[in-house]
Amino acid sequence: RVLRSILVSTQFVVSMILMIVTSVFFMQYRYMINYDLEIDEDNVMVFSVDNIPEGKEETIVQELQTNANIADVTASMTSFFGENASVNVRDFNGKSVDFNVWYVRGNIFDFFGIPMIDGDGLNANSTRWDFVINSYMNQNTGLNIGDKMDTYYTVKGISQDIHNMSLRNGHVNSAYYCSDSFNWYYLRLHEGADVKDVINFVKSTVNEIAPLADEPDVEFLNENIKRIYGDVKKQTILIG
């Protein structure tokens, strides 16, 4: 009888744990695809490109901007969404600071409508030595406008926190370094744009500038986010 009670209790505890884990996974998936990411994602398409010839990343941006259907273009080295940031550890004021890093085009904050809480942020005149931190990192580390990291890199702005990562860890220390090396491109289309024309134009542009690259899959950002977090949904189903 005692053994039976132990087995029943153990089964109950395991069941409760699985229910909690399933709920967390489902909440993360549901949030990322249905709730406000605190960015302007309307009419945004995304694609990635491999095997870009050195120095041609910005050429792709400039060529895409010639299409009448496309209102604006920005880019990043890794996907701006999902858990694709690199994690750096640096010393600041005698304290070890770990933070997530994205390398981005200077206009990415304007493109996604991410406001600066302080400072000018990044722009077309920014250099590779300029970077922006999020509000969470500012409050957590004391880094502020004008402070330097690794002697040369200077904080140019403090951005509003956004939900471009997993909910699992909530907001994290995030830094966005200005770069001219990209693999991910984001297009904002005009209202009523010819989507098929845009997709064909993207593919022909990539083929012309980066002939060794695979043909890109061009999709709307919301579909991209659903796909990124598809594994989370699968885990939810498997665990449940």
Predicted regions and their residues:
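"Rare, low-scoring activations can occur
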Residues: G55-D72, S135-N144, T151-T236
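Structured, solvent-exposed hinge/loop segments at the ends of secondary-structure elements
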Residues: F26-Q139
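Helix-terminus/capping and membrane-interface signal
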Residues: R1-V73, D197, D214-E219, E223-G240
